[in-house]
Amino acid sequence: MRLTDMAPLAAVRGCSFVSLQVGPPAAQLNEPPAGLVVLDVAQWLGDFADTAALVANLDLVIAVDTAVAHLAGALGRPVWLLNRFDSCWRWLLGRDDSPWYPGLRQFRQSGQGEWGSVMQRVAGALEEFVC
């Protein structure tokens, strides 16, 4: 998934987006999708404890299956997992929730590499979340 796939989120009003991305992939923040303003906090994330402190103060984490998604779930924070079509066994097919993290909601691809419909569903859910 690339930052450009998140373009539908730009239409959701009342949200502030914070990037928890570090390393070379964070360079995508230099050219975000039109209208999507993302705060880059990588310079303040020295270690995973810093990431945990930030996650603990966010209203919602939207992430692919990474350590950040698991961290948010373990901290009991609401997390929306953008899950690939052939997801790992731990996400259990046919479920939108997770037995591992009560605050996790899954948005799964309908086909391999298909993020468009996922992000449309996420944008709709985010509209409801902020209202």
Spell out what each predicted region is:
Residues M1-C131:
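Catalytic machinery of carbohydrate-active enzymes
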